[in-house]
């Protein structure tokens, strides 16, 4: 036992020595860093344009009402961007209760694989020299409250979201390693019925805020927005929309995207295919396949 402890101590000391001797001259030369300059963490830009596709995503556009069923979703995504192709596996749990007046939602990326070029690496001030690796994403917790539903006034729902700082590989510019929060109101109105054709326009307006590494302005605040429409026929639905947010720093913090979702419901299950097309400050083209299990909500 004593010999084993000695071996472990020697091994740990060796790892510490090797880590201390790691050569960062390539990063220093690429960015003109000299002794006395701010540390590398201050060089990274905490905005969606300079991080991975899952770092500071635009929150999902909600539709003004709480869904009837509990949902468990497993999704596989492929993010296409020249110089930074990324793949991930994510999950979501949605639980309505109190007669569908309140719901909680939890979601996040379980596993992310990336492989970016030297150009992307240097543009983002990444410390990941070869630009290839894996990461775990941030996890999100949200609460939804139904304010109005099926009245003369449009369906109205309030949502508050908290983002944890659980994402890994900040040094590789994959995740922000900072907390964030947002709140929004979403609205919708139904026209027609699913048996013939249901048309449901919806919109969202809110506020999004996240911590940064800027010592003078440690928080970035943004206006959150979105609008779209559901076209539903029996068990099929198609939803085009656009969404984004406007950060006040204007340093790559104003992502805008188009969203398209085709969804099929069957036997308390559903399948979904989504396509997201980045327009500004988030330029990925994302394809996501989801399988959803549905259960009755909690009374």
Model-derived regions: residue spans:
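Outer membrane beta-barrel transmembrane domains
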Residues: 117, 127-128, 216-217, 223-299
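Short acidic, gly/pro-rich beta-turn/loop elements at beta-sheet edges
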Residues: 84, 103, 116, 151-153, ...
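Transmembrane beta-barrel outer-membrane domains
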Residues: 82-86, 132-138, 174-180, 196, ...
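Surface-exposed cleft-lining segments at the edges of enzyme active sites
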Residues: 128-132, 165-176, 208-216
């Amino acid at each position: 036992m004593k010999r084993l402890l000695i071996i472990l101590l020697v091994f740990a000391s060796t790892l510490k020595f090797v880590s201390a001797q790691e050569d960062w001259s390539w990063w220093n030369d690429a960015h003109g860093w000299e002794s006395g300059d701010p540390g590398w963490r201050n060089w990274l830009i905490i905005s969606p344009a300079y991080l991975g596709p899952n770092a500071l995503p635009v929150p999902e556009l909600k539709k003004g009402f709480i869904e009837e069923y509990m949902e468990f979703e497993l999704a596989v995504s492929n993010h296409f961007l020249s110089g930074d192709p990324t793949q991930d596996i994510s999950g979501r749990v949605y639980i309505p209760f109190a007669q569908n007046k309140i719901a909680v939602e939890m979601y996040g990326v379980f596993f992310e694989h990336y492989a970016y070029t030297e150009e992307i690496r240097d543009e983002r001030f990444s410390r990941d020299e070869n630009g290839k690796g894996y990461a775990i994403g941030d996890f999100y917790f949200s609460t939804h409250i139904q304010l109005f539903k099926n009245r003369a006034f449009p369906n109205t729902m309030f949502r508050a979201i908290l983002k944890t700082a659980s994402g890994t590989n900040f040094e590789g510019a994959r995740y922000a390693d900072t907390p964030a929060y947002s709140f929004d109101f979403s609205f919708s109105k139904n026209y027609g019925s699913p048996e013939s054709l249901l048309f449901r326009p919806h919109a969202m307006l809110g506020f999004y805020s996240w911590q940064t590494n800027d010592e003078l302005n440690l928080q970035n605040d943004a206006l959150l927005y979105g609008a779209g429409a559901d076209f539903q026929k029996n068990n099929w639905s198609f939803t085009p929309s656009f969404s984004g947010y406007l950060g006040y720093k204007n340093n790559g913090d104003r992502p805008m995207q188009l969203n398209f979702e085709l969804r099929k419901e069957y036997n308390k299950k559903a399948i979904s295919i989504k396509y997201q097309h980045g327009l500004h400050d988030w330029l990925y083209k994302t394809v996501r396949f989801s399988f959803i299990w549905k259960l009755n909500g909690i009374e």
